[in-house]
Amino acid sequence: DFEDLVDFDVYSLCGDGCMMEGISSEAASLAGHLRLSKLCWIYDSNRITIEGHTSLAFSEDVAARFEAYGWNVMHVADANDQAALSQAFEVFRRTSDRPTLIIVSSHIGWGSPHKQDTNSAHGEPLGDEEVRLTKENYSWPTEPSFLVPDGVYDCFADRIGKRGAELCAAWSAT
């Protein structure tokens, strides 16, 4: 019984290459057997590996594999659908009898005019020109080359930074 041992949620972000590795099968099988309900794997399914499209070496039904392991399996059809992602996380937090796999369909290099959905977006820098074109695609300023908009920075500092500092202080006090 792991109820008392682990009283917090554990999240892991996994990609196509991770699902191709044997260790993911072994770990997932054990997690299902032990009914580790605090465990949530988010599978970024963009169908691309560093070598190329997953169809080169991977054709299994990941959802069926994890269902066979006893996992709760959910699908989010669009990685940019924040409402669907939030709903999937809520279902995970209410699941008390097994681990959860959330399969999220995405596009690697999303918004890059020449590299979206290619393995070059996985294992290579976009390059200055492709970065400029991608920023134009997003209607972002092209200069400076690295930019975090003030609103994003402020939101992160307020929601993540402040909360993280509070949680760290509470953890350190125990």
Regions flagged by a language model, labelled:
Residues 15-35:
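Glycine- and Gly-Pro-enriched alpha-helical subdomains that act as flexible
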Residues 5-8, 13-14, 18-22, 40-42, ...:
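Conserved acidic/glycine
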